[in-house]
Every structure is written in C-alpha cells, then in structure tokens.
Amino acid sequence: MLKWVQSGLSAVAGTAEPEYGPDAIQPITKRIFDTNNGKIYRATEPKDFEWLSPNYTNVETQTFYFTDLSNGNIGFAQIIHSNVMGLTTTAQFTFRLYNVKDKSINLWTSTKLEDFEIKDSNFYAKDLSLELKDNKVYKLKSSVNKESIVEFEMERLTDGVIFGDDGMSFYGEDPEQPWGSMRHVFWPRCKVNGTITTADNKVIEINNGLTMFVMALQGMKPHHAAKSWNFMNFQSANHSAVQMEFTTPKSYGTTKVNIGIVTDNEKILIASIDNQVVHSDTKFDDVGGWDVPQKIEFNYIDGKDKDKQVASVSGNLSQLVERVDVMAEIPQFVKNIVSGVAGARPYIYQYANEFTIDINNGDGEKVKEDGVGFTEVTFISD
C-alpha cells in the first residue's frame, strides 16, 4: 500500500476534485449484477494475471502475503509497476518480514528495479524474476537487495477469485469512458516454500507456509480514488480469509466498496460483497492525527440476505508492525500541495496479531479457529 499511495501523491498536479456524487463511481459491487450473469465471482484464468500496464497514471502490483504458522513469521513480497502521467515508468520490489512471537524480527526493504520487463503474467528485472507456471505455481527469485534475498515457490490450493467478470470499479460520469479505475484479483489460499536470506547471511526457511496472492491496479491518483482503506489477510491451519474495503472521498459520495473471501484447504467457501468492517476502542494517535482502532472485526455478509452474517474474523490490534508516514519520502513542496489543497495526510497502520475466524455455513455447522491476521488500516484524507 505504501508505494501505491506514494507514487500517486508524488504525481499530484492540482486541486481536490469537485463533488461529482455517488453516480460517478461504478463499483464492482454494483457492476457484478451487469456482468458475469449476475454471479458474484468467477474462477480466475491465467489471462487475469497479465500485467495491464495502461499508458496513463496508474500503479499496478503483485503481492504475496506469507504466513508461517509454525514459527510466527509473516510478511509480504511485492512487485510494483507504476506510470506517472504516461511519461515515466518505474518499478520497485518491497519486502516485509515480521514475527508475531519475536518483535525483534522486523525487516523492511524497498528497492528500485532496473532493466525491468513485463511478459504476460511474468515480470523480470535485473536480479529478479517472477514467473507463473501452469496457472498453478508462481516462482519468485529476488537478489536485488542483500538484506532480503528471497526465493519463494507459491502453489495455489483453491480456485482463484475475480469479482464479477473483470474485477473492475470505474470512476467517471460516463460509464463508457471512465477517467479512473480500481481492480483486484486473488489467489486466496496457497502454500509457500522457500528461503529468506538476510544481510548477516542468516537463512530463514519457510516450509509448507501459507500465502495469499493479490494482483491490483489503481488507475488514478490515490487520494482521489479513496479516503481510507481496511485490509486483512488471515491464515489458519484450515482456513484463509481476505477482506478489502475502500471508501471514496466526498467527491464520489463517500461510497464504500467491500469484497471478501473465505476458503478452506480446497475450495472457496464464501465470496461476498458489501461486507462490514468494525473499528472498536478507537484511540487518537498524536503522531498520525487519526482515531485508530485497538480492536477490529471483519464481517462477511450473505449475498442474498444483507442482514445475515455468514462469517467474521476479529481480534485485538495489539501488535503494531509499523506506522507508515506516506509523506516521509515525498518532497516538501509536494507535501504542501497535497495536505493544503487536497486535504490528505496519509498514514498506514500495519498490524500482525492472533485473530479468530467464525464461520456459519447456514446448515447449522459452525466453525471457529484461531490463526494469524495481517491488517492494514489506512487513512488518506477526511
């Protein structure tokens, strides 16, 4: 999320948008009923993971959120491909490692990529490769940063998920000619094996770990697309859950868009829209200037009965991995424009905690299981 927001804010070239109203966004949660025969989701195909690389301002990412339940290591590996105003294309590899049992393990690297190239679903750069094999396995090799040499193999365990037919939310008063877009495509539960080599040549092994893979596109400036985000990746011995929610600024009617997935080891149990994220015990953060939750709950809502909750993932946000000041690396003159004109003061709060999933399948069977959740609560503007 950090580089995604940073890239767009760095390209800010003017003012806050006028208030177009909620009709100026066509979220995937509404477009579903006009595409894919009204089905909430479909299984992904290899073409869904091809890099789109549009020739206008956008940030496109492929991210693997990994969890090793045996030793508490969690984190993510992310490739970022961004285009600023159709003029400059850059790429970055970011990596996070954190241990929920040992807070001294907290590694973050962000490295600019050189000589990068896109080939369909694959991505190559100097000292880095990411390749999709047989629509089943991703192989990642990166030695671009000696503090985080990564070699992962991720194997999909369930169907992939794309909401609607194309996963797209569009911004603009004319649906046929949108001026912005948002897209997410998922592999919600995968196994991961591999190694992480740190600067002191310590090798951290991941054996039969779990990962959630998401490919995302944000085709407009981030502070215009959303004023806040809630994101959760949960992994336990037998279940995975992901939920992603963004709320638009007033210019698009403060519209909430929420999609979520729950799986077991073999299949998709729930793919739902219009879910609910609940912040509890909020506390004002003097550093970021936001009311930040101390507890959080991600509720999954039945597609046919909006009053029926079919699952939830919840827990305390007691372990703050990092409070990310998105503006920290942005030039001062851009900060002044963004905060003064656009009203943005973006902070990302990253957490890693023990969470609990509760599932009610509607047949009287209820499942409850503890696991580990990685959460991002992002505030961009009021």
Curated annotation (Swiss-Prot):
Major subcellular site: Golgi
Keywords: Cytoplasm, Endoplasmic reticulum, Golgi apparatus, Lipid transport, Membrane, Nucleus, Transport
GO molecular function: ceramide binding
Subcellular location as annotated: Golgi apparatus, cis-Golgi network membrane; Endoplasmic reticulum membrane; Cytoplasm; Nucleus
Keyword field contains Cytoplasm: yes
GO biological process, one term: ER to Golgi ceramide transport
Region of interest (Peripherally associates with membranes), residue spans: 1-18
SUPFAM superfamilies on file: AttH-like (SSF159245)
GO cellular component, one term: cytoplasm
InterPro entries named among the record's database cross-references: Ceramide-binding_SVF1 (IPR051385), Svf1-like_C (IPR033394), Svf1-like_N (IPR013931)
Record's bilayer topology term: Peripheral membrane protein
Function: Ceramide-binding protein that may transfer ceramides from the endoplasmic reticulum membrane to the cis-Golgi network membrane, and is thereby required for the biosynthesis of complex sphingolipids.
Similarity remark: Belongs to the SVF1 family.
Protein name listed in UniProt: Ceramide-binding protein SVF1
Originating species: Candida albicans (strain SC5314 / ATCC MYA-2876) (Yeast)
Biological classification of the source: Eukaryota, Fungi, Dikarya, Ascomycota, Saccharomycotina
Gene symbol of the encoding locus: SVF1
